Amino acid sequence: MPKLTTCLALLFGLLLGGSLAAPAFASDAGPSGSDSDTPYIDLAPAFVTNYDGGGRLRYLKVDVSVRARKPTDEAVRHHMPYIRNSLVTLFSSQLEENITSTDGKEALRLTALEEIRRILTKLDGAGAENILELYFTSFVIQQ
């Protein structure tokens, strides 16, 4: 019985010690000054749309994030419905051969980036150069 008690005390000590160390470790992992000035913005929820599959109904699901300098990140959030509408239209207009290749996905990514820049220029008059990148964090095709 003393051996069991010793093992339990040791286990409890390890668990407690690990939980106390975790907050200090997490605080060191914060963003650096330059990264905090260019936040990532998830355009959630995922875009789910059908696309031209040569007569068959096919679906595309895309998760998108953009990286924007402040204060343009607030403009992206403010105009999110307009941006999402334009991207849904863009994604649904794609042909199957354009989205199944790596080059096609890259071209679509760049087109989506330019579309967001165009929208912000149109609605805010400036700030398009502050949209640094657009990333597909998930890209699923149902064929």
PLM segments and residue spans:
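Flexible, low-complexity charged segments
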Residues: M1-Q143
